[in-house]
């Protein structure tokens, strides 16, 4: 089954971006807390499908072994300890929805009242407010690596996150959704935080929530604290010094493709000294895994006892009892360290003694994806001025 909060749309076209209207009020900053998904609603996750969809998100080629494993139906029931999904409450129109914040996409799309009762059952749904405006002739559609899809209409409505409201914000309301999404009861939609240039609304892309409201904020930035085994936070408009150690290290962002792309200066495995082999990659809260070049992945798993690249499971696996080495990314002279336990993602099936790695190949994408496996170890500032990214170890 697909985990739709961890994947995003294929870009369907680019043109002049239509801006929403922020509510005029004093400049401010605020923090919004994630919430844990309901423990009463356990979910099965096909781990190779998570991997396949992450590759498809960026137009990558999914290896045949991963396709085969993803279609085999093998799945693991995902309890809280695997950090599968933490969501953020957002008021869309008059309804509070739990959305996944995704720095790797630029769409705000939601389950809506346009879906049938059977498709929306178990979800909070968006109902256009009395002041909402439907954009006639505007549509959106997303497609994922496992063949799942969603599409619908576009409205302008109010969207509130924390203490900030955007009026006339583009809201992509689902009117059609495939069965994979219907089965995922934990998530009501997605709020994209990439650059507005890759918004997928046709015929004209729309601005993201962040681009709409950033003029209201004390500073045009947001900071992400994803946590290991716990809900995290998003700070909008300010940097919370209590959430990180030492000083922030900043690096430039190449936003030409619409993503928060940066270049790391090298990497290291375990206690070994980092090398100077650069890694270009995207900081993406909407991807679970850390996807790296084949050579980097091979370097890592050479130091993992019993690790192998498994055709059966569609990726690197290892004995669950194995103690994993850390992975270090060098950014502007700062060593961003991911502890080894973060990289042990989950057993391949319920009760299995074989575990699936949180580091996998980027399958020749040409760049890496620094997903949640990496981000959970860092306080990360997404600063639109520059633009630039700031990194520091979490407090």
UniProtKB/Swiss-Prot annotation:
Disulfide bonds join 320-355. One of its GO terms (molecular function) is endopeptidase activity. It is found in: Secreted. Keywords: Aspartyl protease, Disulfide bond, Hydrolase, Protease, Secreted, Signal, Virulence, Zymogen. One of its GO terms (biological process) is proteolysis. Residues 1-29 form the signal peptide. Residues 86-392 form the Peptidase A1 domain. The active site is at 102, 284. This is Aspergillopepsin-1. It comes from Aspergillus fumigatus (strain ATCC MYA-4609 / CBS 101355 / FGSC A1100 / Af293) (Neosartorya fumigata).
């Amino acid at each position: 089954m697909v985990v739709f909060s961890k994947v995003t749309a294929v870009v369907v076209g680019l043109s002049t971006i239509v801006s929403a209207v922020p509510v005029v009020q004093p400049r401010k900053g605020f923090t919004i807390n994630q919430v844990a998904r309901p423990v009463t609603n356990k979910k099965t996750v096909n781990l190779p499908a998570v991997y396949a969809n992450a590759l498809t998100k960026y137009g990558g080629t999914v290896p045949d072994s991963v396709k085969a494993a993803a279609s085999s139906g093998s799945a693991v029931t995902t309890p809280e300890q695997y950090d599968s999904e933490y969501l953020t409450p957002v008021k869309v129109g008059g309804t509070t929805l739990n959305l996944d914040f995704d720095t790797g996409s630029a769409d705000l799309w939601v389950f809506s009242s346009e879906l049938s009762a059977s498709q929306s059952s178990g979800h909070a749904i968006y109902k256009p407010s009395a002041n909402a405006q439907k954009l006639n002739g505007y549509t959106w559609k997303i497609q994922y690596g496992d063949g799942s899809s969603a599409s619908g209409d576009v409205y302008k409505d109010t969207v509130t996150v924390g203490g900030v409201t955007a009026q006339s914000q583009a809201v992509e309301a689902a009117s059609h959704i495939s069965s994979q999404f219907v089965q995922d009861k934990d998530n009501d939609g997605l709020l994209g935080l990439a650059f507005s240039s890759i918004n997928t609304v046709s015929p004209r892309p729309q601005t993201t929530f962040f681009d709409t409201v950033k003029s209201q904020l004390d500073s045009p930035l947001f900071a992400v604290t994803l946590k290991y085994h716990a809900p995290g936070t998003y700070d909008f408009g300010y940097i919370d010094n209590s959430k990180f150690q030492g000083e922030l290290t900043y690096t430039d962002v190449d936003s030409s493709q619409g993503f928060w792309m940066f270049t790391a200066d090298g990497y290291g495995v375990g206690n070994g000294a980092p090398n100077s082999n650069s890694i270009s990659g995207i900081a993406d809260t909407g991807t679970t895994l850390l996807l790296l070049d084949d050579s980097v992945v091979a370097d890592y798993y050479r130091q993992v006892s019993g690790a192998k690249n498994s055709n059966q499971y569609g990726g690197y696996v290892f004995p669950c009892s194995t103690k994993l080495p850390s992975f270090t990314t060098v950014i502007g002279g700062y060593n961003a360290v991911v502890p080894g336990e973060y990289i042990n993602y989950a057993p391949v099936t319920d009760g299995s003694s074989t575990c699936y790695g949180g580091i996998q190949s980027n399958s020749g994408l040409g760049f890496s994806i620094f997903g949640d496996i990496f981000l959970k170890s860092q306080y990360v500032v997404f600063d639109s001025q520059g633009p630039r990214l700031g990194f520091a170890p979490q407090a």
